Amino acid sequence: MCGRFAQSQTREDYLALLAEDIERDIPYDPEPIGRYNVAPGTKVLLLSERDEHLHLDPVFWGYAPGWWDKPPLINARVETAATSRMFKPLWQHGRAICFADGWFEWKKEGDKKQPFFIYRADGQPIFMAAIGSTPFERGDEAEGFLIVTAAADQGLVDIHDRRPLVLSPEAAREWMRQEISGKEASEIAASGCVPANQFSWHPVSRAVGNVKNQGAELIQPV
């Protein structure tokens, strides 16, 4: 699963790879976002399309509709999200992109778990496919968004882990288009997924395990 990631650069660093200024309805903000330890249950900047323009909204990371009596879900599997009763409406009408610098995976080493930071080897930001309950701008505290995870056995540090479905910038832009059908979105997810050999990773401090910890040192090699 994808349960922690870094979103630290400026909005422009991410947006520049996705769309021209004319396609966006997003105020310019030169300040880095500065989040090196983004955790579920917090509001995260999420990119989506409305009225043919891209919008950036702070959206709750987690999804728990009124009838759901368990902790909020944070991931949706790419193999089943498009057809499952719970996620199909979100797949069809609530596609979005969560941009990031990389994400964290933990691997058991002896009796402890070692965290690793995973990122694109070419240094580009990553664009994680997401689905959620629209309209995103309403700021719902329960029905937010989920990160779509890639097919089983595509983990990197741990082959059995499920990594986020990372799309190329071109595929990410298409994924968000409102006129794209659910079936077409499935095709984009399959053809636009960044392959495993495009990623690098290194071990990082176990301090990232505490959601209260922030700072650039959390993504530095140890």
Curated annotation (Swiss-Prot):
Q: Which GO terms describe its biological process?
A: DNA damage response; protein-DNA covalent cross-linking repair; proteolysis; SOS response
Q: Which Gene3D superfamilies match?
A: SOS response associated peptidase-like (3.90.1680.10)
Record bears the keyword Hydrolase: yes
* Mutation effect (H160E): Impaired activity
Q: Which InterPro entries match?
A: SRAP (IPR003738), SRAP-like (IPR036590)
The reported effect of K113A is: Does not affect binding to single-stranded DNA
Q: Does the UniProt entry include the keyword DNA damage?
A: yes
* Annotated phenotype, changing R85A: Strongly reduced binding to single-stranded DNA
Effect of altering E105Q?
Strongly impaired activity
Consequence recorded when altering H160A: Reduced formation of the DNA-protein cross-link. Slightly increased binding to single-stranded DNA
Per the record, what is the consequence of mutating W106A? Reduced binding to single-stranded DNA
Tell me the impact of changing T149A: Reduced formation of the DNA-protein cross-link. Abolished binding to single-stranded DNA
Outcome (variant: H160Q): Strongly impaired activity
* Pfam families, per the entry: SRAP
Q: How is its activity regulated?
A: Formation and reversal of DNA-protein cross-link depends on DNA context. Catalyzes formation of the thiazolidine linkage in presence of abasic sites in single-stranded DNA. Mediates the reversal of the thiazolidine cross-link in presence of double stranded DNA.
Q: Which UniProt keywords apply?
A: Covalent protein-DNA linkage, DNA damage, DNA-binding, Hydrolase, Lyase, Protease, SOS response
**What are the positions of the active site?**
C2, E105
At what positions is Thiazolidine linkage to a ring-opened DNA abasic site found? C2
Protein family membership: Belongs to the SOS response-associated peptidase family.
The protein's job, in short, is:
Sensor of abasic sites in single-stranded DNA (ssDNA) required to preserve genome integrity by promoting error-free repair of abasic sites. Recognizes and binds abasic sites in ssDNA at replication forks and chemically modifies the lesion by forming a covalent cross-link with DNA: forms a stable thiazolidine linkage between a ring-opened abasic site and the alpha-amino and sulfhydryl substituents of its N-terminal catalytic cysteine residue.
What more is known?
A: The thiol group of the catalytic Cys-2 is deprotonated by its alpha-amino group to form a thiolate anion that is poised for catalysis. The abasic site sugar moiety is in equilibrium between its cyclic furanose and open-chain aldehyde forms. The Cys-2 thiolate anion attacks the abasic site C1' position to form a covalent bond. The Cys-2 alpha-amino group proton then transfers to the oxygen which is stabilized by the Asn-75 side chain. The O4' rotates to a new position and interacts with the His-160 side chain.
* Domain observations: The N-terminal catalytic Cys-2 residue forms a thiazolidine linkage to a ring-opened DNA abasic site. Glu-105 catalyzes reversal of the thiazolidine linkage; self-reversal is favoured by duplex DNA formation. Glu-105 is also involved in sensing abasic sites in single-stranded DNA (ssDNA). His-160 stabilizes the abasic sites by forming a hydrogen bond with the O4' hydroxyl group.
Name-wise, this protein is Abasic site processing protein YedK
Which gene codes for it?
yedK
